[in-house]
């Protein structure tokens, strides 16, 4: 199964598409005391093997940890397939040097990296086109989101549902939480306004958790970043 949440010594493991479980079926698990993972911790996103499954209480025991493909350090999440570097074009204003630092950090993961530009309803179509051209010349797919154009979001959501495990990375206040609330109905993470003084947002997400958005896809809900993860 897939570890979708971690808290204290417990792990929430989803058995969707594993064995007899076609739909999402989550179990609260602890690691078997006799198991030694060679000092290797278990993270959200890890694939694990569970036994002693109790269908009534939804409890089980983790007996082994499968080899992971990658591990993001901050926040700690494993087996990412896609990273979407997310920045707003206004409020706060786009900072190209900061975008570059996030891109460099993401590239070190060895996964597919794309750019998402939010709040594009605050700029002209001309500037939007110039930004797309600039970043695509850098070699990155660039997705623009506009509150007045639902088709932009719907096209992006369709793309996300084709990916295995996607994460949004970027500074606070750029709209990651709002975007996650749109992608995952019922999530309802709180949002916070951008500070007029420091021109940055406040982190509104506290715990790392995976949410299923299709039979094959998950989205990582993570704490925001105030600065570049380098």
PLM ranges: what are they?
Residues 69, 186-217:
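Switch I (effector-binding) loop of TRAFAC-class P-loop GTPase G-domains
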């Amino acid at each position: 199964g897939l570890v979708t949440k971690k808290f204290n010594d417990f792990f929430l493991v989803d058995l969707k598409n594993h064995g007899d479980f076609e739909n999402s079926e989550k179990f609260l698990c602890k690691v078997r005391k006799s198991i030694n993972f060679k000092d290797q911790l278990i993270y959200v996103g890890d694939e694990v093997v569970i036994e002693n499954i109790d269908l009534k209480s939804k409890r089980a025991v983790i007996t082994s940890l499968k080899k992971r493909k990658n591990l993001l350090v901050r926040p700690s999440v494993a087996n990412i397939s896609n990273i979407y570097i997310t920045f707003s074009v206004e409020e706060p204003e786009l900072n190209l040097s900061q975008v570059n630092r996030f891109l460099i950090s993401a590239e070190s993961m060895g996964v597919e990296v794309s750019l998402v530009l939010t709040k594009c309803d605050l700029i002209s179509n001309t500037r939007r086109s110039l930004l797309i051209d600039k970043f695509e010349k850098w070699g990155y797919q660039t997705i623009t989101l506009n509150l007045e154009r639902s088709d932009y979001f719907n096209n992006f959501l369709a793309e996300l549902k084709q990916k295995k495990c996607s994460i949004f990375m970027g500074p606070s206040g750029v709209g990651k939480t709002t975007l996650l609330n749109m992608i995952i109905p019922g999530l309802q993470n709180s949002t916070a306004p951008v500070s007029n003084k420091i021109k940055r947002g406040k982190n509104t997400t506290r715990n790392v958790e995976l949410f299923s958005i299709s039979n094959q896809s998950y989205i990582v809900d993570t704490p925001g970043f105030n600065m570049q993860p380098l």
